[in-house]
Amino acid sequence: DDVISLGVGEPDFDTPWHIRDEGIYTLEKGRTFYTSNSGLKELREEITHYLKRRFELEYDPMHEVLVTVGGSEGIDVALRAMLDPGDEVLIPQPAYVSYLPCVVLADGGPVTIELQEKNQFRLTKEELLAHITDKTKVLVLPFPNNPTGSIMTKADLEPVAEFIKEHD
């Protein structure tokens, strides 16, 4: 009981009933068909409304929003769109097991950055400086981090953001 599993994301609780009830309701209504590959139109529209309200950003839900089944699929699709053969991708470690293979499948070169427990597994500007090259194109910044649960605060992220802007 005192062991915390750091394995693949299996919750240690049952799915709440309000979620189960909605699934049952949806099945009873006959909504058992595939959605569009880009995601439900209504969800894409709601995402654009949220982005407008929260961040004053405007996107076309029909052409600029893609709903994936999870974060890993989204990262995979983004890497395949951005990488050219030989481009390097910085991946802080430990990290979710799929990031490195996604880079390899997109013809990129994964470069791992071993995060330090003394920094609570938070990425630092110094660690970026030690790993960036002229081939670096992408930084995977997966926080909150799986499997450590590490979270980067705004104060942690600001120097990283400055570094990224400096190295475009």
Segments predicted by a language model, with ranges:
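Glycine/Thr-rich phosphate-binding loops of Rossmann-like dinucleotide-binding domains
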Residues: 14-16, 75-76, 99-100, 148-149
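A short helix-loop-beta submotif of the ANL/AMP-binding
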Residues: 104-111
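Short acidic capping loops at alpha-helix termini that bridge into adjacent secondary structure
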Residues: 59-65, 85-88, 135
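Active-site phosphate-binding strand-loop segment of PLP-dependent enzymes
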Residues: 111, 115-168
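Short glycine-rich anion-binding loops that position phosphate/pyrophosphate groups of nucleotides
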Residues: 11, 72, 96, 143-147
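Conserved PLP-anchoring active-site segment centered on the Schiff-base-forming lysine
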Residues: 81-103
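N-terminal small-domain helix-loop-helix segment of the aminotransferase-like
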Residues: 1-69, 77
